[in-house]
Amino acid sequence: MEPAFGEVNQLGGVFVNGRPLPNAIRLRIVELAQLGIRPCDISRQLRVSHGCVSKILARYNETGSILPGAIGGSKPRVTTPTVVKHIRTYKQRDPGIFAWEIRDRLLADGVCDKYNVPSVSSISRILRNKIGNLAQQAHYDSYKQHQPAPQPALPYNHIYSYPSPITAAAAKVPTPPGVPAIPGSVAMPRTWPSSHSVTDILGIRSITDQVSDSSPYHSPKVEEWSSLGRNNFPAAAPHAVNGLEKGALEQETKYSQAPNGLPAVGSFVSASSMAPYPTPAQVSPYMTYSAAPSGYVAGHGWQHAGSTPLSPHNCDIPASLAFKGMQAAREGSHSVTASAL
């Protein structure tokens, strides 16, 4: 019986798209063909398409079967465990062997015949999926056997220190006599990794430490600079004035010439005995000054009562000093006088 659902072809017959023709109709087509009826007449009589009738009759003449589907069924399995074992053996003996060479060896060794030998693509798939991991593991094991033993890592403890120029400088310091020698690993100064402080970033601490290690005298570090005051410095010697050697200054005064019209004074007064400068009097820039030095030196209102025109603060001026400022003022007074005239 024909199914109650489907589509109607051009002859009025009903069929289901994608489904094979029922076996009863197939058998009827073959019987009518054996009676000598033409395929076109069978198609009109059974209301089946001409192409379907021709295909069924052609398959029956070739195979003798009216059943649908692939003729002879699927191909039997060729990748048997025995074949896989032989392929693994070939690959282990020669890791660089090709798939087509394995196929030829399977035929030469009689493992397979020309009907059940696997194809080149099947052998490649077996090598990739089933034997590839084993080959890589064997290669890795052989590589580990030939690989030399790794060197032991350096111990990181309180004895180990980072290489730095300070360690090289400390290694050159000889050991004092009478003191037992210390091994080099213990004698090296310990320098920890640099922190994020300003002194460590700029390298000030390492520089001061290196100077203190190489110098026989005590050198204060950066941390000690803030605690140092003027009281910590030694006082000047009696024969030194303001931190300078008096003998050297007197030697310079022998070869220096005093300015014309100015007396030579050879003594010094400490800065603590000098009075502070009072506020200078306002002087008009258009006033006319005399060319004589005593004219503009004695005219200032801030001159001390017991001082001389050359030393208004009651202190002596060394003869080695050149009165360039007074000479410049003297020349400036001449220019102002000339411009005013």
Swiss-Prot record:
RED subdomain: annotated segments: 82-130
Oligomer and partners: Interacts with KDM5B.
Species name: Saguinus oedipus
Compartment(s) where it occurs, according to its Swiss-Prot or TrEMBL record: Nucleus
Keywords tagged on the record: Developmental protein, DNA-binding, Nucleus, Paired box, Transcription, Transcription regulation
PANTHER family: PAIRED BOX PROTEIN PAX-6-RELATED-RELATED, PAIRED BOX PROTEIN PAX-9
Name assigned to this protein: Paired box protein Pax-9
Major localization listed first in the record, in broad terms: nucleus
